From Swiss-Prot:
Organism: Tityus obscurus (Amazonian scorpion)
Disulphides: 30-86, 34-60, 45-67, 49-69
Gene Ontology molecular-function annotations: sodium channel inhibitor activity; toxin activity
Protein name: Sodium channel toxin To13
Function description: Inhibits voltage-gated sodium channels (Nav).
């Protein structure tokens, strides 16, 4: 019982934030386009996901020509593939 209490208290004190994967949206509600160049697109997305969004990394999903990010904070708004790629948020 004490162990459970310590674990719960630790999470509260650390304010653990959830993570998710997805196509992030910018401040205008648009996804990050990465184009058709595989090398440039993957480098751009990986850097943007790590630096701007504090994720683990990312790459260009060439099916949608949009950046996909791994392990980004839950607070980042992401695109659902049935929505328009630019949407007011």
């Amino acid at each position: 019982m004490k162990t459970l209490f310590l674990i719960i208290t630790s999470f509260i004190l650390l304010e653990v934030e959830g993570i998710k994967n997805g196509y992030p949206r910018d401040s205008k509600g648009c996804t990050f386009e990465c184009g058709q160049d595989a090398k440039h697109g993957d480098d751009y997305c990986d850097k943007m996901c790590k630096t701007t969004l504090k994720g683990e990394g990312g790459d260009c999903d060439f099916e949608y020509a949009e950046c996909w990010c791994d392990n980004i904070p839950d607070t980042v708004v992401t695109w659902k593939n049935k929505e328009p790629k630019c949407k007011q948020i």
